[in-house]
Amino acid sequence: MSKEKFQRTKLHINVGTIGHVDHGKTTLTAAITAVLAKAYGGNALAFDQIDNAPEEKARGITINTSHVEYDTKNRHYAHVDCPGHADYVKNMITGAAQMDGAILVVAATDGPMPQTREHILLARQVGVPYIIVFINKCDMVDDSELLELVEIEVRELLSQYEFPGENTPIIRGSALKALEHDVDWTSKIIELAEVLDSYIPEPKRAIDKPFLLPIEDVFSISGRGTVVTGRVERGILKVGEEVEIIGIKNTTKTTCTGVEMFRKLLDEGRAGENIGVLLRGVKRDDVERGQVLAKPGSIKPHTKFASEVYILNKDEGGRHTPFFKGYRPQFYFRTTDVTGTIELPIDVEMVMPGDNIKMIVNLIAPIAMDQGLRFAIREGGRTVGAGIVTDIIE
């Protein structure tokens, strides 16, 4: 029991492996758990324990993902690994597994391949802030010039997608040899662990960000006024502070005159808590589900944005047929649906179920949004896609 307690004192970081099929992402994941379990305690997992990933649902989409955990000298890591390319696309777009940093696995025998590029692009689009490179299968390449070449190609590719290619840490190793406890190669896993600790900074916690609460319900309490309820997404709201009500209608400003949780009055509501907020001088009809309460000036309402979207296939309960420009589904942000129209890239005539695609969306009503906000695409309450805001246009 004491060990559990000890782990909680360590800083917690979320990471994952990305990269081309068969370049050794899962083998590396297994090697990390094996080598670090020996060095710092924890459980070693075999390749097949990680490879048959359980299904999970995120925003109505089924994704196969393996979650493993391990300790380094200074930190505790939660690590995601996906068996298939489509699972990565879905995972990154839905944000099912948010990553503070990613380990890009590139086989020395192949160099960068199409999915290497696609995963780097996705990491850029969905806001994965840091990438570390592990060049795998180095035991199979005798020519050091070839390794140099692979390294140069990877750095160029990272720079192309606005990651700092020149300064990205690159480790050369062999996951398979490390799993066989070959000391020359286990040392590379330890090196990777040290780089994870030093290169990925401590992420900013939700509680330190500006206050935001997506409104789920609105009540009027006679003699007290209007109460909105919801789960605080980020930040802290103290009684007496000003807040803005943003989205759907024109933005208005009011003051929080009370915070309650489980029918008890509090001085403040914090990230992660389900609270009721009493608002001064606000009528029941002025507020609705789908709006947000936010720190004044911290977030703005928008109607037009660029996005990266995954469209469910038929087996996932999605559409059976493609759609074309002029498609008008609902876009579900936080707690509500808003109808919108889409613009497809010039060279795209139609979008098939199972595709991932960039699209520009025009909403009929404004929603409080920042880059990185995730949404579902729905038709009559049924989820047909998932997306992330990559750029705000207006």
UniProtKB/Swiss-Prot annotation:
Mg(2+) binds at residue 26. It comes from the Bacteria. Residues 19-26 are annotated as: G1. Keywords: Cytoplasm, Elongation factor, GTP-binding, Hydrolase, Magnesium, Metal-binding, Nucleotide-binding, Protein biosynthesis. Its EC number is 3.6.5.3. One of its GO terms (molecular function) is GTP binding. It catalyses: GTP + H2O = GDP + phosphate + H(+). It is found in: Cytoplasm. It is an enzyme of class 3 (hydrolase). GTP binds at residues 19-26, 81-85, 136-139. Residues 174-176 are annotated as: G5. Residues 10-204 form the tr-type G domain. Residues 81-84 are annotated as: G3. Residues 60-64 are annotated as: G2. Pfam families: GTP_EFTU, GTP_EFTU_D2, GTP_EFTU_D3. SUPFAM superfamilies: EF-Tu/eEF-1alpha/eIF2-gamma C-terminal domain, P-loop containing nucleoside triphosphate hydrolases, Translation proteins. The keyword Metal-binding applies. GTP hydrolase that promotes the GTP-dependent binding of aminoacyl-tRNA to the A-site of ribosomes during protein biosynthesis. HAMAP family: EF_Tu_B. This is Elongation factor Tu. The lineage of its organism: Bacteria, Pseudomonadati, Pseudomonadota, Gammaproteobacteria, Candidatus Palibaumannia.
